[in-house]
Amino acid sequence: MIRDLSIAARGVWAPACANALVLPGKLNVLVGPSGAGKTSTIYALMQLIEPDRGEICLRDQDSATDINVRELAREQWWKTITWVPQHPTLIPGTLREQLPPASNDDLEAAASLCAFSDVLDSLPLRWDTPIGQGGIGLSVGQRQRFALTRALVATTPIVILDEPTAHLDAASEEVVLRAIETLRGQGRTVIAIAHRQALIEAADQVIEIHSAQMN
């Protein structure tokens, strides 16, 4: 739940969807003009920045009370989230070392769904291939597909996607939409920033964010 959230940047307040309820187990898409505060809203959710006004809360279904995410231990909160940034980077090491524990069958199934299998086939050691600083040797689109693969095999209840189709052609966009449908089918809450129409049309809920100059 987002309540009266505002984040200041360069003197501009971004009252990010003043009041909105994120639907659990559904695809929630954030839309709005560039600079409106979509990414800042995500950062606030992840405790990377602190809102200047308002709060983001979780609803405790048992007690019907709301818990401000700022009250949660950051490390424990992060364990519930898988984040796929717009420009994924990889740390030096093998691909397998950057994945959560999973069987080879699960990894291969996720890679196939995310159209990462062709990349794997081109690597000499597949999952055990060393990747350089920042994912050298993989394009931005390939790193994004790897990040989606990682999200599919993770078990976090929340998945955050920052413009997951931004660097993809129409065919690859369909791949991403299928992956998101799988996440939704797993009962996971997906929050995505989107500009492209196909992802917006696939949403269970569209949350509009607008910036506003405030004195």
Regions found by a protein language model. Give the residues of each.
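Conserved beta1/A-loop at the N-terminus of ABC ATPase nucleotide-binding domains
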Residues: I2-P15, I56-L58
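ABC nucleotide-binding domain signature
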Residues: V29, E75-T89, I191
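The feature captures the beta-strand-to-loop junction immediately N-terminal to the Walker
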Residues: V31-P33
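ABC-family ATPase nucleotide-binding domain "signature/switch" substructure
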Residues: S40, Q98, T129-N215
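Helix-to-loop junction immediately C-terminal to a conserved catalytic motif
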Residues: M46
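Conserved catalytic motifs of ABC-family nucleotide-binding domains
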Residues: I49, T82-N104, I200
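ABC ATPase NBD Q-loop/coupling interface
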Residues: E55-K79
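ABC ATPase nucleotide-binding domain helical subdomain, centered on the C-loop/LSGGQ "ABC signature"
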Residues: Q61, R96-G132, L177-R178
